[in-house]
């Protein structure tokens, strides 16, 4: 348990940031789930649309510090390859 006033404030801030980051991470996962559903269904148009929506959301998570840059790039690259494969 935090004892000093600054430690108590830090604990409050961490709690708020954790809630925000959890929401951001959840939002990214939702977009990825929609894309995954479109890919497994084999729906080309839905997959392309879902990818166009998911890619900026993933990169936004990077700028907000939720995902690491390389992790996001790897995810986007692999998803783009899968979308390209279904489109061909």
From Swiss-Prot:
A Pfam family of this chain: Ribosomal_S20p
Function text: Binds directly to 16S ribosomal RNA.
GO biological process, one term: translation
Chain's gene name: rpsT
GO CC annotations, alphabetized: cytosol; small ribosomal subunit
Species of provenance: Azorhizobium caulinodans (strain ATCC 43989 / DSM 5975 / JCM 20966 / LMG 6465 / NBRC 14845 / NCIMB 13405 / ORS 571)
The organism's place on the tree of life at top rank: Bacteria
Claim: Cytoplasm is one of the keywords in the record: no
Amino-acid biosynthesis keyword on record: no
NCBIfam families the UniProt entry points to: S20 (TIGR00029)
Start and end residues of each stretch annotated as Disordered: 1-25
Protein family membership: Belongs to the bacterial ribosomal protein bS20 family.
Xref: InterPro entries: Ribosomal_bS20, Ribosomal_bS20_sf
Protein name: Small ribosomal subunit protein bS20
This protein's UniProt keywords: Ribonucleoprotein, Ribosomal protein, RNA-binding, rRNA-binding
GO molecular function, one term: small ribosomal subunit rRNA binding
